[in-house]
Design a protein with these regions (language model features):
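Short aromatic-enriched loop/helix-cap "lid" or pocket-rim segments at secondary-structure transitions
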Residues: 47-50, 173, 202-205, 355-356, ...
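Conserved Rossmann-like nucleotide-cofactor binding loop
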Residues: 19, 42, 167
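Short, solvent-exposed loop/turn segments at secondary-structure boundaries
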Residues: 46-50, 241, 307-310
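Conserved N-terminal helical subregion
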Residues: 2-11, 26, 51-194, 240, ...
Length: 406
Protein backbone atom coordinates (compact mmCIF):
# COMPACT_ATOMS: atom_id res chain seq x y z
CA UNK A 1 0.00 0.00 0.00
CA UNK A 2 1.33 3.46 -0.89
CA UNK A 3 2.51 5.48 2.10
CA UNK A 4 0.89 8.95 2.18
CA UNK A 5 3.00 12.00 2.96
CA UNK A 6 1.95 14.97 5.09
CA UNK A 7 0.34 16.67 2.09
CA UNK A 8 -1.96 13.85 0.97
CA UNK A 9 -2.64 12.10 4.30
CA UNK A 10 -6.19 12.92 5.39
CA UNK A 11 -7.67 11.62 8.65
CA UNK A 12 -11.47 11.34 8.97
CA UNK A 13 -12.66 11.53 12.58
CA UNK A 14 -16.20 10.39 13.33
CA UNK A 15 -17.36 11.90 16.61
CA UNK A 16 -16.61 15.29 18.18
CA UNK A 17 -16.75 14.31 21.81
CA UNK A 18 -13.74 14.99 23.99
CA UNK A 19 -11.66 12.18 22.49
CA UNK A 20 -12.34 13.16 18.88
CA UNK A 21 -11.56 16.80 19.65
CA UNK A 22 -8.29 15.97 21.44
CA UNK A 23 -7.30 13.87 18.43
CA UNK A 24 -8.18 16.74 16.08
CA UNK A 25 -6.14 19.19 18.18
CA UNK A 26 -3.15 16.84 18.17
CA UNK A 27 -3.33 16.32 14.40
CA UNK A 28 -3.61 20.06 13.84
CA UNK A 29 -0.60 20.62 16.09
CA UNK A 30 1.34 18.02 14.08
CA UNK A 31 0.37 19.57 10.74
CA UNK A 32 -1.61 16.52 9.60
CA UNK A 33 -4.79 17.15 7.61
CA UNK A 34 -8.06 16.01 9.17
CA UNK A 35 -11.84 16.42 9.02
CA UNK A 36 -14.10 15.83 12.00
CA UNK A 37 -17.81 14.97 11.85
CA UNK A 38 -20.45 14.94 14.59
CA UNK A 39 -24.03 13.64 14.40
CA UNK A 40 -25.26 16.10 17.05
CA UNK A 41 -26.53 19.39 15.66
CA UNK A 42 -24.38 21.61 17.88
CA UNK A 43 -21.87 21.59 20.70
CA UNK A 44 -23.21 20.57 24.13
CA UNK A 45 -26.88 20.78 23.16
CA UNK A 46 -27.78 18.06 25.66
CA UNK A 47 -28.74 19.22 29.15
CA UNK A 48 -27.13 16.26 30.89
CA UNK A 49 -23.77 16.95 32.56
CA UNK A 50 -21.17 14.87 34.36
CA UNK A 51 -17.59 15.21 35.52
CA UNK A 52 -14.49 13.17 34.70
CA UNK A 53 -11.11 12.64 36.31
CA UNK A 54 -7.79 13.16 34.54
CA UNK A 55 -4.79 11.85 36.48
CA UNK A 56 -2.22 9.38 35.10
CA UNK A 57 -2.75 10.64 31.52
CA UNK A 58 -2.24 14.33 32.34
CA UNK A 59 1.31 14.50 30.97
CA UNK A 60 0.18 12.83 27.74
CA UNK A 61 -2.59 15.41 27.41
CA UNK A 62 -0.04 18.20 27.86
CA UNK A 63 1.93 16.81 24.89
CA UNK A 64 -1.15 16.37 22.71
CA UNK A 65 -2.84 19.74 23.09
CA UNK A 66 -1.45 22.99 21.69
CA UNK A 67 0.16 25.03 24.47
CA UNK A 68 -2.55 27.69 24.36
CA UNK A 69 -5.23 25.05 24.95
CA UNK A 70 -3.48 23.23 27.79
CA UNK A 71 -2.79 26.57 29.47
CA UNK A 72 -6.54 26.85 30.11
CA UNK A 73 -6.91 23.46 31.79
CA UNK A 74 -7.04 24.87 35.32
CA UNK A 75 -9.79 27.28 34.25
CA UNK A 76 -12.08 24.38 33.26
CA UNK A 77 -11.31 22.38 36.39
CA UNK A 78 -14.21 21.66 38.72
CA UNK A 79 -12.20 23.50 41.35
CA UNK A 80 -9.94 26.03 39.57
CA UNK A 81 -8.46 27.04 42.93
CA UNK A 82 -6.52 23.76 43.08
CA UNK A 83 -3.32 23.49 41.00
CA UNK A 84 -2.97 20.60 38.54
CA UNK A 85 0.09 19.28 40.39
CA UNK A 86 -1.35 19.69 43.90
CA UNK A 87 -2.09 15.98 44.30
CA UNK A 88 -3.93 14.58 47.28
CA UNK A 89 -6.19 11.74 48.33
CA UNK A 90 -9.57 11.05 46.73
CA UNK A 91 -11.90 10.13 49.61
CA UNK A 92 -14.06 7.00 49.61
CA UNK A 93 -16.68 7.47 52.31
CA UNK A 94 -19.07 4.96 53.90
CA UNK A 95 -22.45 6.45 53.03
CA UNK A 96 -24.32 5.12 56.06
CA UNK A 97 -21.73 6.04 58.70
CA UNK A 98 -19.96 8.98 57.08
CA UNK A 99 -16.61 7.44 57.97
CA UNK A 100 -13.66 7.60 55.60
CA UNK A 101 -13.02 4.11 54.22
CA UNK A 102 -9.94 5.01 52.21
CA UNK A 103 -8.15 7.81 50.47
CA UNK A 104 -7.01 7.00 46.95
CA UNK A 105 -3.76 8.92 46.36
CA UNK A 106 -2.99 10.83 43.18
CA UNK A 107 0.15 12.84 42.44
CA UNK A 108 -1.44 15.27 40.01
CA UNK A 109 -4.72 15.70 38.20
CA UNK A 110 -8.10 17.36 38.14
CA UNK A 111 -11.78 16.78 37.52
CA UNK A 112 -13.47 18.47 34.59
CA UNK A 113 -17.12 18.93 33.58
CA UNK A 114 -17.81 17.28 30.25
CA UNK A 115 -19.23 20.44 28.67
CA UNK A 116 -16.31 22.69 29.66
CA UNK A 117 -13.67 20.19 28.58
CA UNK A 118 -15.42 19.69 25.26
CA UNK A 119 -15.65 23.44 24.75
CA UNK A 120 -11.95 23.94 25.54
CA UNK A 121 -10.89 21.24 23.08
CA UNK A 122 -13.18 22.55 20.32
CA UNK A 123 -11.49 25.95 19.99
CA UNK A 124 -9.96 26.31 16.54
CA UNK A 125 -11.45 23.02 15.33
CA UNK A 126 -13.88 23.10 12.39
CA UNK A 127 -16.45 20.49 13.39
CA UNK A 128 -19.01 19.51 10.76
CA UNK A 129 -22.22 19.06 12.76
CA UNK A 130 -25.36 17.17 11.80
CA UNK A 131 -23.34 14.44 10.07
CA UNK A 132 -24.84 11.05 10.87
CA UNK A 133 -22.68 8.23 9.47
CA UNK A 134 -24.63 5.53 7.61
CA UNK A 135 -21.96 3.73 5.59
CA UNK A 136 -18.22 3.29 5.12
CA UNK A 137 -16.81 2.35 1.72
CA UNK A 138 -13.30 1.27 0.80
CA UNK A 139 -11.68 1.93 -2.56
CA UNK A 140 -10.62 -1.07 -4.60
CA UNK A 141 -7.12 0.37 -4.88
CA UNK A 142 -6.78 -0.01 -1.08
CA UNK A 143 -5.62 3.59 -0.91
CA UNK A 144 -8.55 5.24 0.80
CA UNK A 145 -11.84 5.21 2.65
CA UNK A 146 -15.13 7.03 2.11
CA UNK A 147 -17.58 8.09 4.85
CA UNK A 148 -21.23 8.33 3.76
CA UNK A 149 -23.69 10.45 5.77
CA UNK A 150 -27.48 10.45 5.91
CA UNK A 151 -27.72 13.90 4.32
CA UNK A 152 -26.27 12.46 1.11
CA UNK A 153 -22.80 13.93 1.58
CA UNK A 154 -19.57 11.94 1.48
CA UNK A 155 -16.00 12.48 2.62
CA UNK A 156 -12.86 10.74 1.38
CA UNK A 157 -9.71 10.19 3.39
CA UNK A 158 -6.71 8.00 4.08
CA UNK A 159 -8.05 6.55 7.33
CA UNK A 160 -11.36 6.72 9.20
CA UNK A 161 -11.23 6.77 13.01
CA UNK A 162 -14.28 5.98 15.11
CA UNK A 163 -14.37 8.33 18.10
CA UNK A 164 -18.15 8.12 18.30
CA UNK A 165 -18.60 6.89 21.83
CA UNK A 166 -19.90 3.77 23.59
CA UNK A 167 -22.59 2.94 21.00
CA UNK A 168 -20.24 3.52 18.10
CA UNK A 169 -21.57 3.20 14.57
CA UNK A 170 -18.01 2.85 13.31
CA UNK A 171 -17.57 -0.15 15.61
CA UNK A 172 -20.45 -1.86 13.81
CA UNK A 173 -18.59 -1.51 10.51
CA UNK A 174 -15.32 -2.63 12.11
CA UNK A 175 -16.93 -5.72 13.66
CA UNK A 176 -19.06 -6.51 10.63
CA UNK A 177 -22.43 -6.40 12.40
CA UNK A 178 -24.44 -4.44 14.95
CA UNK A 179 -24.80 -7.57 17.09
CA UNK A 180 -21.05 -8.10 17.48
CA UNK A 181 -20.59 -4.42 18.30
CA UNK A 182 -23.49 -4.23 20.78
CA UNK A 183 -22.77 -3.10 24.31
CA UNK A 184 -23.76 -5.15 27.36
CA UNK A 185 -25.89 -3.72 30.11
CA UNK A 186 -24.44 -3.13 33.55
CA UNK A 187 -27.52 -3.95 35.68
CA UNK A 188 -27.68 -0.84 37.79
CA UNK A 189 -30.04 2.13 38.05
CA UNK A 190 -27.64 5.06 37.89
CA UNK A 191 -28.91 8.61 38.29
CA UNK A 192 -26.99 11.84 37.92
CA UNK A 193 -27.97 15.46 38.23
CA UNK A 194 -26.59 18.99 38.21
CA UNK A 195 -27.54 20.89 41.36
CA UNK A 196 -27.22 24.49 42.54
CA UNK A 197 -28.45 25.04 46.09
CA UNK A 198 -28.52 28.87 45.85
CA UNK A 199 -27.57 28.85 49.52
CA UNK A 200 -24.01 29.42 50.73
CA UNK A 201 -24.34 27.40 53.94
CA UNK A 202 -25.87 24.41 52.20
CA UNK A 203 -23.16 24.47 49.55
CA UNK A 204 -20.34 24.74 52.10
CA UNK A 205 -21.71 21.81 54.08
CA UNK A 206 -21.32 19.53 51.08
CA UNK A 207 -18.09 20.86 49.63
CA UNK A 208 -16.40 17.65 48.44
CA UNK A 209 -13.78 17.17 45.75
CA UNK A 210 -15.79 14.58 43.88
CA UNK A 211 -19.07 16.53 43.75
CA UNK A 212 -18.17 20.09 42.73
CA UNK A 213 -18.85 20.59 39.03
CA UNK A 214 -17.98 24.26 38.71
CA UNK A 215 -17.64 27.53 40.62
CA UNK A 216 -19.16 30.13 38.26
CA UNK A 217 -18.44 33.08 40.57
CA UNK A 218 -15.34 31.63 42.21
CA UNK A 219 -14.63 29.91 45.53
CA UNK A 220 -15.83 32.90 47.56
CA UNK A 221 -19.42 32.58 46.32
CA UNK A 222 -20.62 29.10 47.35
CA UNK A 223 -24.24 30.03 46.72
CA UNK A 224 -23.45 29.77 42.99
CA UNK A 225 -21.44 26.55 43.13
CA UNK A 226 -22.71 23.85 40.79
CA UNK A 227 -22.58 20.27 42.08
CA UNK A 228 -22.65 17.03 40.15
CA UNK A 229 -24.49 14.45 42.24
CA UNK A 230 -25.08 10.79 41.49
CA UNK A 231 -26.84 7.93 43.21
CA UNK A 232 -26.90 4.36 41.94
CA UNK A 233 -28.35 1.07 43.10
CA UNK A 234 -29.06 -2.36 41.60
CA UNK A 235 -32.62 -2.37 40.28
CA UNK A 236 -34.08 -4.33 37.37
CA UNK A 237 -37.80 -3.55 37.55
CA UNK A 238 -40.07 -0.70 38.59
CA UNK A 239 -37.60 2.01 37.69
CA UNK A 240 -38.98 5.55 38.13
CA UNK A 241 -39.58 7.17 34.74
CA UNK A 242 -39.89 10.90 35.41
CA UNK A 243 -37.47 13.42 36.88
CA UNK A 244 -39.71 13.95 39.90
CA UNK A 245 -40.25 10.23 40.52
CA UNK A 246 -36.49 9.70 40.45
CA UNK A 247 -35.93 12.63 42.81
CA UNK A 248 -38.53 11.30 45.25
CA UNK A 249 -36.82 7.89 45.30
CA UNK A 250 -33.40 9.51 45.79
CA UNK A 251 -34.68 11.55 48.73
CA UNK A 252 -36.20 8.43 50.26
CA UNK A 253 -32.98 6.43 49.91
CA UNK A 254 -30.95 9.35 51.25
CA UNK A 255 -32.62 9.07 54.67
CA UNK A 256 -30.38 6.09 55.49
CA UNK A 257 -27.22 8.10 54.74
CA UNK A 258 -25.05 9.98 57.19
CA UNK A 259 -24.59 13.73 57.05
CA UNK A 260 -23.72 15.69 55.00
CA UNK A 261 -24.80 13.27 52.24
CA UNK A 262 -28.34 12.91 53.63
CA UNK A 263 -29.06 16.63 53.48
CA UNK A 264 -27.26 17.14 50.19
CA UNK A 265 -29.76 14.83 48.48
CA UNK A 266 -32.76 16.00 50.53
CA UNK A 267 -32.04 19.64 49.62
CA UNK A 268 -32.04 19.04 45.87
CA UNK A 269 -34.46 21.59 44.35
CA UNK A 270 -37.79 20.19 43.14
CA UNK A 271 -37.25 21.26 39.53
CA UNK A 272 -33.93 19.41 39.16
CA UNK A 273 -33.61 17.20 36.09
CA UNK A 274 -32.61 13.79 37.44
CA UNK A 275 -31.14 11.89 34.52
CA UNK A 276 -30.95 8.12 34.17
CA UNK A 277 -27.61 6.98 32.78
CA UNK A 278 -27.60 3.72 30.86
CA UNK A 279 -24.35 2.17 32.12
CA UNK A 280 -22.99 -0.26 29.58
CA UNK A 281 -19.74 -1.74 28.33
CA UNK A 282 -18.16 -3.64 25.46
CA UNK A 283 -15.25 -5.98 26.11
CA UNK A 284 -12.64 -4.87 23.60
CA UNK A 285 -11.72 -7.40 20.92
CA UNK A 286 -9.87 -7.31 17.59
CA UNK A 287 -11.62 -5.99 14.49
CA UNK A 288 -10.89 -5.79 10.77
CA UNK A 289 -8.94 -2.57 10.23
CA UNK A 290 -9.12 -2.93 6.44
CA UNK A 291 -5.40 -2.61 5.79
CA UNK A 292 -5.16 0.13 8.40
CA UNK A 293 -7.92 2.30 6.93
CA UNK A 294 -10.41 1.87 9.81
CA UNK A 295 -9.83 1.90 13.55
CA UNK A 296 -11.39 2.88 16.86
CA UNK A 297 -10.38 5.13 19.72
CA UNK A 298 -11.64 5.99 23.20
CA UNK A 299 -15.11 4.92 24.28
CA UNK A 300 -15.77 3.52 20.81
CA UNK A 301 -13.00 0.98 21.49
CA UNK A 302 -13.47 0.32 25.21
CA UNK A 303 -16.70 1.69 26.76
CA UNK A 304 -16.65 0.92 30.48
CA UNK A 305 -18.63 1.59 33.66
CA UNK A 306 -17.47 4.80 35.38
CA UNK A 307 -16.43 3.24 38.67
CA UNK A 308 -12.64 3.65 38.76
CA UNK A 309 -12.13 7.02 37.07
CA UNK A 310 -10.29 5.50 34.11
CA UNK A 311 -12.33 6.20 30.97
CA UNK A 312 -10.99 9.58 29.86
CA UNK A 313 -7.44 8.62 30.83
CA UNK A 314 -7.48 5.67 28.45
CA UNK A 315 -9.03 7.87 25.75
CA UNK A 316 -6.09 10.26 26.10
CA UNK A 317 -3.63 7.36 26.12
CA UNK A 318 -5.21 5.99 22.92
CA UNK A 319 -4.82 9.37 21.25
CA UNK A 320 -1.16 9.55 22.19
CA UNK A 321 -0.41 6.12 20.71
CA UNK A 322 -2.55 6.67 17.62
CA UNK A 323 -0.92 10.02 16.86
CA UNK A 324 2.52 8.40 17.12
CA UNK A 325 1.42 5.72 14.63
CA UNK A 326 0.01 8.25 12.16
CA UNK A 327 3.23 10.27 12.42
CA UNK A 328 5.18 7.18 11.33
CA UNK A 329 2.94 6.80 8.29
CA UNK A 330 3.37 10.46 7.34
CA UNK A 331 7.15 10.22 7.86
CA UNK A 332 7.31 7.16 5.62
CA UNK A 333 8.77 4.87 8.28
CA UNK A 334 5.73 2.55 8.37
CA UNK A 335 2.88 1.61 6.11
CA UNK A 336 -0.66 2.45 7.19
CA UNK A 337 -1.40 -1.22 7.83
CA UNK A 338 1.76 -1.67 9.92
CA UNK A 339 1.22 1.48 11.96
CA UNK A 340 -2.46 0.94 12.76
CA UNK A 341 -1.98 -2.75 13.50
CA UNK A 342 0.78 -1.81 15.96
CA UNK A 343 -1.50 0.79 17.58
CA UNK A 344 -4.26 -1.79 18.01
CA UNK A 345 -1.83 -4.41 19.35
CA UNK A 346 -1.15 -2.13 22.33
CA UNK A 347 -4.60 -0.61 22.76
CA UNK A 348 -6.91 -3.62 22.43
CA UNK A 349 -5.49 -5.69 25.33
CA UNK A 350 -5.17 -2.56 27.47
CA UNK A 351 -8.78 -1.61 26.77
CA UNK A 352 -10.05 -5.14 27.32
CA UNK A 353 -8.24 -5.37 30.64
CA UNK A 354 -9.65 -2.06 31.89
CA UNK A 355 -13.23 -2.78 30.77
CA UNK A 356 -13.21 -6.07 32.67
CA UNK A 357 -11.63 -4.39 35.68
CA UNK A 358 -14.20 -1.57 35.70
CA UNK A 359 -17.08 -4.05 35.48
CA UNK A 360 -15.65 -6.04 38.38
CA UNK A 361 -15.06 -2.86 40.37
CA UNK A 362 -18.64 -1.72 39.75
CA UNK A 363 -20.04 -4.89 41.30
CA UNK A 364 -17.64 -4.89 44.23
CA UNK A 365 -18.21 -1.24 45.15
CA UNK A 366 -21.90 -2.06 45.64
CA UNK A 367 -21.18 -5.03 47.93
CA UNK A 368 -19.92 -4.27 51.46
CA UNK A 369 -18.42 -7.78 51.72
CA UNK A 370 -16.20 -7.16 48.69
CA UNK A 371 -15.59 -3.42 48.55
CA UNK A 372 -12.17 -3.51 50.21
CA UNK A 373 -10.97 -6.10 47.68
CA UNK A 374 -12.11 -4.04 44.70
CA UNK A 375 -9.61 -2.79 42.10
CA UNK A 376 -9.96 0.82 43.21
CA UNK A 377 -8.76 -0.21 46.68
CA UNK A 378 -6.00 -2.51 45.40
CA UNK A 379 -4.81 -0.39 42.49
CA UNK A 380 -6.09 3.13 43.12
CA UNK A 381 -6.15 5.26 39.97
CA UNK A 382 -3.16 3.58 38.36
CA UNK A 383 -3.73 1.82 35.02
CA UNK A 384 -4.12 -1.91 35.39
CA UNK A 385 -1.48 -4.42 34.37
CA UNK A 386 -2.28 -8.06 33.80
CA UNK A 387 -5.86 -7.84 35.10
CA UNK A 388 -7.70 -10.07 32.66
CA UNK A 389 -9.29 -12.82 34.70
CA UNK A 390 -12.88 -13.91 34.83
CA UNK A 391 -15.54 -13.40 32.20
CA UNK A 392 -18.20 -10.77 31.71
CA UNK A 393 -19.12 -11.91 28.22
CA UNK A 394 -22.32 -13.63 29.35
CA UNK A 395 -24.22 -10.51 30.34
CA UNK A 396 -27.28 -9.40 28.45
CA UNK A 397 -26.51 -7.61 25.19
CA UNK A 398 -28.08 -4.21 24.56
CA UNK A 399 -29.30 -4.31 20.98
CA UNK A 400 -30.02 -1.20 18.87
CA UNK A 401 -33.78 -1.50 19.46
CA UNK A 402 -33.20 -1.48 23.24
CA UNK A 403 -30.97 1.59 23.02
CA UNK A 404 -33.52 3.53 21.00
CA UNK A 405 -36.23 2.78 23.55
CA UNK A 406 -34.37 4.35 26.48
Amino acid sequence: MTVPNSEDAHVLIIGAGITGLILAQSLKKAGIRYSIFEKEVSMNYRSNEWTMAIHWSLDRLRDLLPADRFAHMESVSCNPDVALDAGGNYPIIHGETGHLIAGVPYAKGLRVPRSKMRDLCSKGIDVQYGKNLIDVAFTESQKGVVAVFDDGSMASGTILIGADGPRSKVREFAMGSAEKAAVSRFPIFHTNMTVTYNDAEKARSYHAFQSISSMPDGPDHPESWVFHLAMAWFMDHGQPATYRERLDMIREKAQSLAEPARSSFTWIPDDTQVHKADISYWVTQPWDNRQGRLTLIGDAAHPMPPYRGQGLNHCICDTSHLLASIRKVVAGTASLKEAITAYEAEMIPRGREEVKCSVENGYMLHDWDQVRESPVFRQGFRPMSGHDRGSVDGHEKMQPKDIAAN
